[in-house]
């Protein structure tokens, strides 16, 4: 059956129960040391969207903000249809590839770095690559849904696709890095495939598989990701954006999810924006 084995350790000493996780080196720590992250939360389905974003960024440049890493959301690839997986074409309503490439070139002229979103968790039925055979399964054999008309991609399939897709994004658009969504954001068991002969049907299988997928994205440039379960992948990417969960994040005690003796080389925690935008 589908089972997990858990071991619980209790102690009055924090350092005795802190999990020991490997900390690989991505080799990009110095590259990002001086850069502030600018996270674009949403891009409207309009041909003026990139112009508006650029004007905002140019205003920041005039104010003296010279080192900025601009992280782009999944709307770069779609116009509200959620087809953001394995895509190599800019969203049509925003001007397609021409508008996206011109905008990214303009960011370089400002001296800013950019990252484009990638996601290997699910695939939409509207995606040209959609095939029921590449979808993970539930225990009853049906494709595992992750949202409206979207299904969990077999993570063995994702693992084989991710390296080339990530490299293709950087080669085509000349961006500085990749912004990986979901893989360090949701728990690794959410990627479990219950189909016959599945390569990741348990936490013990899913965790190293997700670590491999994340690691493949840092081979050709900067790689950052959305967090939430990022403590399981310390050092695999160059950094994680992870807001504290809950209705009132500023009133929730921060979760200590890092080794206090190795805070600096693993991650930097920061709070910016409104009081409810503290990062975990």
Task: Give the role of each language-model region.
Residues 67-280:
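Aromatic- and carboxylate-enriched substrate-binding clefts and catalytic-loop regions
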Residues 1-68, 72-75, 92-94, 106, ...:
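Carbohydrate-recognition beta-sandwich/jelly-roll modules
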């Amino acid at each position: 059956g589908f089972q997990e084995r858990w071991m619980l350790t209790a102690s009055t000493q924090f350092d005795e129960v802190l999990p020991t996780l490997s900390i690989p080196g991505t080799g990009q720590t110095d590259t990002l040391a001086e850069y502030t992250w600018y996270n674009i939360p949403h891009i409207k389905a309009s041909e003026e969207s990139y112009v508006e974003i650029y004007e905002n960024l140019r205003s920041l440049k005039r104010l003296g903000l010279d080192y900025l890493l601009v992280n782009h959301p999944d709307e770069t690839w779609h116009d509200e249809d959620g087809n953001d997986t394995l895509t190599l074409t800019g969203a049509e309503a925003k001007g397609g590839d021409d508008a996206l490439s011109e905008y990214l070139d303009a960011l370089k002229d400002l001296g800013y770095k950019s990252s484009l979103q990638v996601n290997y968790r699910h695939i939409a039925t509207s995606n040209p690559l959609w095939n029921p055979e590449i979808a993970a399964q539930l225990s009853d054999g049906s494709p595992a849904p992750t949202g409206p008309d979207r299904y969990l991609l077999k993570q063995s399939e994702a693992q084989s696709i991710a390296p080339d897709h990530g490299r293709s994004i950087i080669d085509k658009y000349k961006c500085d890095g990749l912004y990986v969504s979901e893989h360090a954001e949701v728990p690794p068991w959410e990627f479990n495939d219950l189909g016959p002969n599945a390569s990741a049907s348990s936490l013990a299988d899913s965790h190293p598989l997700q670590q491999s997928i994340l690691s493949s994205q840092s081979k050709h440039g900067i790689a950052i990701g959305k967090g939430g379960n990022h403590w399981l992948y310390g050092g695999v990417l160059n950094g994680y954006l992870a807001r504290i969960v809950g209705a009132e994040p500023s009133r929730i005690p921060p979760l200590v999810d890092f080794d206090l003796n190795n805070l600096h080389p693993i991650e930097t925690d920061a709070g910016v924006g409104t009081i409810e935008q503290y990062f975990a």
